[in-house]
A protein has these predicted regions:
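A conserved catalytic-core segment of Leloir-type glycosyltransferases
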Residues: 31-94
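Acceptor-binding helix/loop patch of EC 2.4 sugar-transfer enzymes
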Residues: 2, 6, 67-76, 96-97, ...
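An aromatic- and histidine-rich active-site surface loop
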Residues: 7, 76-91, 99-124, 128-137
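Membrane-proximal helix-turn-helix segments that form the acceptor-binding/catalytic region
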Residues: 91, 110-113, 117-122, 148-168
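Carbohydrate-associated surface elements
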Residues: 35, 174, 192-195
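Nucleotide-activated donor-dependent transferases that construct or modify glycoconjugates
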Residues: 1-15, 33
Length: 215
């Protein structure tokens, strides 16, 4: 997941929490992420690709990616460089981490290409996780043209992910029909929403008086 974070760094949190719980159950979990994400409060300072860091029992592997300020060409280049680094180092990844399951879960579906190749090389299962419908979101909510080259590239990548996955995991319970139309086998769909770690929400604070008065 290009944008994977942690409680200290900031979003995205889902990869961290799922990986942490899997690690508690005895699984050896590795997250490969980009060194820069617009979603994080802080980003790791690294000087080279494949810098490793352990956070709460989960191994993070950082790929050096470009910084960007907005949804422009710089962000697209960051996506490209992340996926290119994964593809170029797929043999190294397989030999070092020996995966039996590979999950692609970045917001954008381009990571399905290197993830599938890594899984195939390792003889591993390939899972694609969807939490934002790209490119559907880009033209339905973002106003981009379906003929935009970026949208077209994302559509090819999304279709590839659905066709090649052994399982497609989604936070969206009603996405199955759409995914099936784009190549997913119906029985490959799994709906897994975000969970809640109850003991991390035990601390309660008194509601400020101005809020109580307003409501």
């Amino acid at each position: 997941n290009h944008y994977a974070g942690s409680p200290e760094m900031g979003m995205e949190f889902r990869p961290y929490y799922i990986s942490r719980e899997l690690a508690k159950k005895g699984h050896n979990v590795t997250i490969i992420a980009g060194s820069f994400s617009h979603l994080r409060k802080t980003n790791p300072a690294i000087s080279e690709n494949f810098t490793e860091q352990e956070i709460d029992g989960v191994k993070y592997v950082w790929i050096k990616t470009d910084e960007y300020d907005s949804n422009d060409i710089a962000r697209a280049l960051s996506m490209y460089h992340f996926c290119r680094a994964l593809t170029a180092n797929k043999k190294k990844i397989v030999e070092r981490y020996k995966p039996d399951v590979v999950i692609s879960s970045s917001t954008y579906p381009l990571d399905s290409y290197p993830a599938y190749r890594i899984a195939k090389l390792a003889g591993a299962k390939y899972i694609h996780e969807v939490h934002d419908m790209w490119p559907l979101t880009l033209y339905e909510a973002g106003g981009m043209s379906r003929k935009n080259p970026f949208v077209i590239a994302m559509q090819f990548a999304e279709d590839h992910a659905y066709k090649k996955s052994d399982v497609v995991v989604s936070l969206l319970p009603h996405a199955k029909d759409y995914m099936t139309e784009h190549g997913m086998k119906p029985d490959h769909f799994r709906y897994i929403p975000n969970g809640v770690v109850i003991n991390e929400w035990d601390t309660t604070r008194e509601v400020p008086s101005e809020h109580r008065e307003a409501f």
